Amino acid sequence: MARKYGKAARKCSRCGDHSAIVRRYGLNLCRQCFREIAPKIGFKKYN
């Protein structure tokens, strides 16, 4: 039975990890995967 709420309810769509999920804009990526592919999908880092 899948979890319906809580931290383990969602997983990274790229690696399957359950921790530190970025859900904004429907990304559903963990923070590590987001950092790897952010430039490819159009995110820029400003200082």
From Swiss-Prot:
NCBIfam families hit by this protein = PRK05766.1
Name the record gives this protein: Small ribosomal subunit protein uS14
Its needed co-factors are: Zn(2+)
Which GO-annotated molecular functions does the record name? rRNA binding; structural constituent of ribosome; zinc ion binding
Residues noted as binding Zn(2+) in the record, renumbered to the chain: 12, 15, 30, 33
Entry annotated with the keyword Disulfide bond: no
- Check the record and name the Gene3D superfamilies matching this protein: 30s Ribosomal Protein S14, Chain N
Any idea what job this protein has?
Binds 16S rRNA, required for the assembly of 30S particles.
Q: List the disulfide bonds.
A: none
Q: Which InterPro entries match?
A: Ribosomal_uS14 (IPR001209), Ribosomal_uS14_arc (IPR023676), Ribosomal_uS14_CS (IPR018271), RIbosomal_uS14_euk_arc (IPR039744), Ribosomal_uS14_sf (IPR043140)
Keywords from the named record: Metal-binding, Ribonucleoprotein, Ribosomal protein, RNA-binding, rRNA-binding, Zinc
Lineage, top-rank taxon, reads: Archaea
Tell me which Gene Ontology terms the entry assigns under biological process. Answer: cytoplasmic translation
Pfam families (alphabetical): Ribosomal_S14
Q: Which HAMAP family match?
A: Ribosomal_uS14_2_A (MF_01364_A)
